[in-house]
C-alpha cells in the first residue's frame, strides 16, 4: 500500500519486557513486516532501563524489511553523541537504510536516579539540544567538528564512515512541555505530543502525535473491541497512580488531567488504556469515518506525523490503514 501525502505513519515495536525471551526476535520481525505492508514509514523502538538495547532491535527490523526506518529512542544518559552518530552512519554504510532518532530528555525519573543523573527537567532539554546538535553536525559535515558547550565538548572530531546525505536521520523530540517545544524549534525537529482531543490543541508546525487507534465499520463494533482489549483494571489503575507519583513528565500529567475531563462524556478520544497502565498514549475509538475525521483535524492543525501504539495483529494495522486511506481521499478530493 502506498503512503499518504498528508500523514506520515509510524508504528511501534514490541517491548522485550512484555514478551517471552525465545519469542521476542520473531515478534519484532513480524510486527516490522506488518508495519511495512501497511505503508508505515518507520517503527518506534523504545529505550529504558528495563528493555533490550534499541540498536540491536533496530538491526532485527532492518534485516526483516526492505525499507522500513527504525525510529530509535535515544537518551543522553546512555551513550555519548559520537556513539549515536557512529550507529547511524554504520547502519547507512552497512544497509543503506535511513534511521529516525526519537530524542528523549529523560524518560522515567527512577531510571535516571538509578544512573545517578539528577539533572532537573528543563535542564535535561538544554543538554538534549547540545547532544543532538553534535550528532547532526558529525553526520552532516565532511570536516572535523569542534563543539564547546555546557554539557559536551569535542575537538576536531570526524565521523567515519561518511553518511550519504539522503540518509541523514529524521529528528523527533517530545514536545509536550514548553522546554520540549523550545528544544524542538532550536533543532528543527518534529515535536511529538501525547495529544489532547484535536479540538483542544493549538495549531502547530512540523509536529506529530503518539496515539492508538481502534476502528471498525461501525462505532459499536469498535467500542466492543476496545472494551475487550482494554477492560477495567483496578490493579492497573493503582500502578498508573504510582507511576504518576514518581514522574516529572509534563505529558504524563497533561494526559492524566485530560482523563479527568473525559470521564464525564463518551467520545472518540479514550484514555482507559493509559489510566490502567497498559500504554502511554491516548486512543481514538470509533467507525473508520469517525476516526478519519479526527485524524484529519489533527493533520489540519499541523500534526502530520502519527506514531501508533504497538499493533496487536496484522489485521489491526489493516483496519488502521482503512482510516488513513479515508484521510488521504479527503485531501485528494
Per-range role (PLM):
Residues 1-67, 168-169:
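N-terminal beta1-alpha1-beta2 module of alpha/beta enzyme domains
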Residues 3-12, 43-45, 69-74, 99-103, ...:
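Hydrophobic faces of well-ordered beta-strands that scaffold small-molecule active sites
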Residues 2, 33-37, 58-67, 88, ...:
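Acidic (Asp/Glu)-rich catalytic clusters
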Residues 6-26, 73-77, 81, 167-176, ...:
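Active-site mouth loops of central-metabolism enzymes
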Residues 2-3, 115-116, 121-163, 198-297:
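An alpha-helical appendage that flanks or caps ligand/catalytic pockets
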Residues 27-47, 183-193, 297-304:
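Catalytic domains of carbohydrate-active enzymes, especially glycoside hydrolases
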Residues 43-54, 77-82, 193-200, 215-217, ...:
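Acidic-and-aromatic substrate-binding clefts and catalytic sites of carbohydrate-active enzymes
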Residues 54-72, 127, 131, 321-333:
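Alpha-helix-loop-beta-strand connector modules within alpha/beta enzyme cores
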Amino acid at each position: 500500500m502506498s503512503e499518504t501525502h498528508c500523514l506520515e505513519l509510524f508504528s511501534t515495536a514490541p517491548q522485550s519486557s512484555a514478551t517471552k525471551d525465545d519469542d521476542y526476535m520473531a515478534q519484532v520481525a513480524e510486527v516490522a513486516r506488518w508495519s511495512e505492508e501497511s505503508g508505515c514509514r518507520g517503527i518506534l523502538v523504545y529505550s529504558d532501563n528495563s528493555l533490550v538495547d534499541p540498536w540491536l532491535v533496530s538491526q532485527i527490523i532492518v534485516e526483516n524489511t526492505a525499507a522500513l526506518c527504525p525510529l530509535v529512542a535515544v537518551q543522553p544518559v546512555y551513550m555519548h553523541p559520537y556513539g549515536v552518530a557512529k550507529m547511524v552512519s554504520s547502519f547507512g554504510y552497512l544497509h543503506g537504510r535511513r534511521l529516525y532518532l526519537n530524542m528523549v530528555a529523560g524518560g522515567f525519573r527512577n531510571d535516571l536516579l538509578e544512573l545517578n543523573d539528577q539533572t532537573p527537567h528543563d535542564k535535561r532539554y538544554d543538554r538534549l539540544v547540545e547532544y543532538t546538535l553534535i550528532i547532526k553536525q558529525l553526520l552532516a559535515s565532511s570536516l572535523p567538528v569542534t563543539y564547546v558547550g555546557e554539557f559536551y565538548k569535542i575537538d576536531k572530531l570526524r565521523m567515519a564512515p561518511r553518511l550519504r546525505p539522503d540518509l541523514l536521520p529524521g529528528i523527533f523530540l517530545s514536545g509536550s512541555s514548553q522546554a520540549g517545544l523550545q528544544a524542538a524549534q532550536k533543532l528543527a525537529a518534529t515535536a511529538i505530543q501525547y495529544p489532547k482531543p484535536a479540538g483542544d490543541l493549538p495549531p502547530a508546525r512540523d509536529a506529530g502525535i503518539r496515539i492508538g487507534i481502534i476502528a471498525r465499520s461501525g462505532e459499536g463494533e469498535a467500542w466492543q473491541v476496545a472494551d475487550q482489549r482494554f477492560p477495567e483494571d483496578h490493579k492497573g489503575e493503582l500502578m498508573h497512580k504510582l507511576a504518576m507519583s514518581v514522574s516529572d513528565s509534563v505529558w504524563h500529567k497533561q494526559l492524566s488531567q485530560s482523563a479527568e475531563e473525559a470521564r464525564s462524556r463518551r467520545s472518540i478520544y479514550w484514555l482507559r488504556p493509559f489510566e490502567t497502565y497498559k500504554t502511554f498514549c491516548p486512543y481514538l475509538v470509533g467507525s473508520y469515518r469517525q476516526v478519519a475525521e479526527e485524524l484529519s483535524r489533527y493533520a489540519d492543525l499541523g500534526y502530520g506525523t502519527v506514531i501508533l501504539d504497538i499493533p496487536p495483529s496484522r489485521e489491526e494495522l489493516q483496519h488502521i490503514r482503512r482510516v488513513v486511506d479515508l484521510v488521504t481521499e479527503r485531501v485528494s478530493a
